[in-house]
Amino acid sequence: MSNPVVELITQDIVEKIDAIKVADGWNQDLNAVRPTRLGNDENLPIDNGLVIVHQEDPDDTDLDADRGSQGLKAWAQPYLLECIVWQDDDATTPIDTLINRVRADIEKKLMEDESRGGNAIETLLGGSMKFTDEGDAELTGIIILITVQYRVRLTDPYTKSN
C-alpha cells in the first residue's frame, strides 16, 4: 500500500532523527517516536533522548501562485519535535548546554536534505521553547518547530509535484 506524500515526509523526519547517534559523531543518541493516538503520549517510554514527533494540521501556502499551474496544491506542514533532555542531580554540565546540543544536532541533521528525500520543496526551521514538567522535575527538554513545504496534485495527495 502506498503512502501519501505527507506521510513519506514524516517518515523521513523520524528516520533522520533516529540516525543521530554518538557512534556516528553526534553529541547524543536520539530516538524518534510518533504517538499512536492523538492527545495521548502516556504510553510512550519517556527517556533521555526521546524525540516525540507531533504532526500538526497543515496550512495552505501561496506557493501555487509561483507555478502558475492549476491542478496543484501546496501545503505547509508544521511539526513539533518534543525532545526529552535531563541529567542526574550530580551532573556539572549546564542543562542549557545539553538542550543546545540536542537542538543543534536535530537542526543540522534535518537540513542535510531540505527536500525530505525529494518529497518536499523545502524544510524551514522555526523557533524553539524549553520546557519543564512541573509534576516531574527531571522531565525537561525543548520543543523545536519545523515546517515542511510540499506540493501535490490537487486530486492526488499521493503524487508529489515539486
Predicted regions and their residues:
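Conserved aromatic-histidine-acidic binding/catalytic patches
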Residues: 1, 5, 94, 134
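Small/polar-rich, solvent-exposed N-terminal microdomains that initiate assembly or binding
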Residues: 1-68, 118, 157-162
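Extracellular/virion structural assembly segments
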Residues: 8, 70-76, 84-108
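Acidic-leaning, charged glycine-interspersed low-complexity segments
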Residues: 19-28, 46-55, 96-154
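Generic secondary-structure microfeatures
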Residues: 54-59, 79-87, 110
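Residues embedded in well-ordered secondary-structure elements
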Residues: 68-70, 135
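Oligomerization/assembly interface segments of phage tail-like spikes and tubes
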Residues: 71-88, 139-152
